Amino acid sequence: MAILVAVTGWEAGPWVRRLQELAPQRRILETGIDGIFAGNRGDLEEVRYVLAWMPRVELLADLANLRVLFSLGAGVDHILGLPVLPEVPIARIVDPDLTARMSEYVAWQVLHHHRQGFAHIRLQAERHWEELRQPAAGEVTIGIMGLGVLGRDAAEVLVRLGFHVIGWSRSEKAIDGIVTYHGKPGLDVFLGQSDILVSLLPLTPATAGLINRSLISRLKRDGPLGGPVLINAGRGGSQVDADIAAALADGTLVGASLDVFEDEPLPPGSPLWGLTNLVITPHVAAVSSPRALARNIIDQITAFESGQSLQHLVDPARGY
């Protein structure tokens, strides 16, 4: 029973080598970086499991004996957005390594804005020595949108750093020591308290374009940072790039950090590139590590074949 690594834009080699280390008895197949399988088409009949990142729909259609589709990304919209889905379970990979990487990114960006990173970079360029007032972490409220595994862990990390953390999610969630809000009724209350808004939302019909001019205008305006800050490490489709660019340019947002965008790679002509109060990273907040995640997948496959239930199954209707 073969495993196929079907990825577009990534080199499959590191995944293949790690899977072969962990499961030498299994046949491991791979696509090219273009997502196309160039091997013997007859070999696809052996494929029972696919590890996917932006898989080609025509390739999935050729897998007559597929049993499980594993997403190699933190999100699953790259699969759920396909015009036709195979009628098999889709599983997300939830792993401590991936979770830790996301929390590191969130903490890095929160601290950059909290400790006035842009101002210090400017002062250094000007060769000017000036002590800036530094608010305590406890004076700053971090609002986290999306309270799944990644959001919960990021919230706990920020609490340990001393920040006041609140959360918002589609449905009601309870997290010890963190005030949470949910649904449309809770959104405005949540936004009105947030000095730094961190989005770790999945991309669903309900979240598409949610971070727009209207939402940004409802963020807290009189906080210790001089205005609100936006951090998005969730999905690019949840934001309106043009609205964020305009808000950064006119001061509605005093700063932002974006790891995701509506169009990726971010086009050279995007106005976001020229903004000096924006940190841009190329969708690397939580890059999947073959060494860590392949073990998780092999363990899941082994358990599944022994009759156990798969973990972290995706509900296509909900989008995550």
Q: What is each of the regions a protein language model found here?
A:
Residues 92-105, 119, 264-320:
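C-terminal helix-to-coil terminal segments
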Residues 46-121, 135:
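Phosphate/diphosphate ligand-binding glycine-rich loop within oxidoreductases
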Residues 172-271:
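Rossmann-like adenosine-cofactor binding region
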Residues 40-43, 59-62, 189-193, 271-272:
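Structural alpha-helical scaffold elements that stabilize or flank donor/cofactor-binding regions
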Residues 54, 73, 199-201, 234, ...:
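Glycine-rich, N-terminal phosphate-binding loop of Rossmann-like dinucleotide-binding domains
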Residues 120-153:
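Glycine-rich NAD(P)-binding loop of Rossmann-like domains
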Residues 1-49:
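N-terminal glycine-/charge-rich "phosphate-binding" loop or analogous flexible N-terminal tail
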Residues 160-177:
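NAD(P)-binding Rossmann-fold cofactor-contacting core
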